[in-house]
Amino acid sequence: MIAVLLLVFGMTPDYIFPVSADIPVVPNFDAQKTVGKWHPIGMASKLPEVPEYEQKISPMDHMVELTDGDMKLTANYMDGVCKEATAMLKHTDKPGVFKFTGGEIRMMDIDYEKYLIMYMKKSTFEAMYLSARGSDVGDDIKEKFKKLVLEQNFPEAHIKYFNAEQCTPTAA
């Protein structure tokens, strides 16, 4: 019964939906170097249909801040009007691995000045994301992303690249 309640509320323990130890993590990951603005370039999901919330939030610029090793991600997204969403990623004892309610993020590959490739697993959704400091990356980085996506057994047809207009919420 507890497992059912945890599933309903999105707080799934690792033993129910474990993240594979085979997912690579950047050695010597330095969270401080990720602070600042990141532009989403692309994503891949294991599902043919991306959940509605992910469709809205994934293509939007993300701002990264750090507090005591935890990452605060802030993104603006369109939902009729421009809104802001914030997520807290709690650091773990393994650099480059972060937990959030109902899931985990692993930093798979990074050039702190250019791009970031990360893996996210929730109880009902698995995805990989490519973000960049600028509004685009070269074909070599897109190929690296594609290679990592395929190595994690994501379907190639589920890779998509963004071309989204950004928004800024108006002050209340």
Swiss-Prot record:
Pfam families: Lipocalin. It is found in: Secreted, Extracellular space. InterPro entries: Calycin (IPR012674), Lipocalin (IPR002345), Lipocln_cytosolic_FA-bd_dom (IPR000566). Keywords: Disulfide bond, Secreted, Signal, Transport. Residues 1-21 form the signal peptide. GO terms for cellular component: extracellular region. The keyword Signal applies. Belongs to the calycin superfamily. Lipocalin family. This is Epididymal secretory protein 4. It comes from Zootoca vivipara (Common lizard).
